[in-house]
């Protein structure tokens, strides 16, 4: 090895080793002071990335556990409110059982109804005011997603329902049949629920009116009023329009003792084209079985021609010049005797007029308006109803009434209309009006109406309605109990996962103090030795002086 002065290689090597050891000592001191094995990416690039992902998961799962606990609180709050609603329903059921017995006076029933109404109002109050962190949990149908994981899509859904007297089917619940039920103001949601067709702010809703029947047309007739009607004669052939008088006592329509043309007799007894009707003609007590054709011709039951003789009687001898071939019109016009014709359940009794041959006086039985009309006839005086083939026709199969090509319906006010749709308008303030600007409401049956209230009626099968309401509450509470248990399980799992991830992260990221203290001690000793050796190395160039002094 050459002896030089300018470069002290031993000193340089020693300094380099001291610097390396200094870095190791610094790293050990940093790890011991922070408690972390990885203080920056240079310590362990891959380990730092893995540990950082663990940090995200751990923090996310910790928050998810808090979210799940909040979800449990929501379910508990909702279930607690439902418990109170159930208590009110049980009391209402108890009162309903009490009201169902016949020993109650009207005053007793009124008192029971008052408490029932108060209980229903309390149910509505609980529904509208039960909140969790400002969220109404029983005021509307909806779902609340609870994030129970550190990643997207890791949720549990709490299904919430609107629970009030309306959704429970108890709006207007009544045990005494008195008072009125306030309808609720209609909203956009009600129009949407009615499957409305929307154009701008106009919502067109199918009204669901019932098809009008003949009885609906006759509903306005009162005692003594007349109805102009086309009545089927029993053979499927419609007669021309005739006035019928309504008798409120017997609830029947009749056409009695009417003076009319002899030809009018045929419209009650003439069968359809191609058909033949069999019946009996009785003249002054003498009966004759006959056949009547579609043109009104009268023949014997065996098909032989019949004639009317000068006395007004039927005969088979057609040789006399004074005989007239028998027909309904000639029989009525030429006969001055009491005559009755019975065919197909329709009976006409008439007497001809010898002075005015073309005029007869007769009464009709059997050709009455359909029985369905009787049930809907009401006392509305002064209302004459025109019911003719020119105005309305009745489908013989369904009984539905049509007007031209349009079907006729009965609206909610029992008025006739050819439209089965109703237009509603959504205003800027959220209110709903009809075409006339009247406010629109929703009644207890969910129908849209302009009536602010509906006359109360005793609820049909009230105990059944209450049992169904209680059952719906039980079902909702069961679902909330199930979701509470699920969330509780989720919290336990989240805590376990967080613990395991934290341990895994610690193994990667945290400093091992035993190892690091050993490394620090080693580095300190080496540092001290290095400093001593460096002093010795720095003295090596002085050996060259001994050569110069020699």
Swiss-Prot record:
Entry keyword Iron-sulfur: no
Example of a GO cellular component annotation carried by this entry: bacterial-type flagellum
Highest taxon of source: Bacteria
Subcellular location: Secreted; Bacterial flagellum
InterPro entries the UniProt entry points to: Flagellin (IPR001492), Flagellin_C (IPR046358), Flagellin_C_sub2 (IPR042187), Flagellin_N (IPR001029), FliC_H7 (IPR032826)
Keyword ATP-binding belongs to the record: no
Keywords: Bacterial flagellum, Secreted
Annotated GO MF terms: structural molecule activity
Pfam families (UniProt xref): Flagellin_C, Flagellin_N, FliC
Described purpose of this protein according to its UniProt entry: Flagellin is the subunit protein which polymerizes to form the filaments of bacterial flagella.
Family to which this protein belongs: Belongs to the bacterial flagellin family.
Name used for this protein in its record: Flagellin
Organism: Shigella flexneri
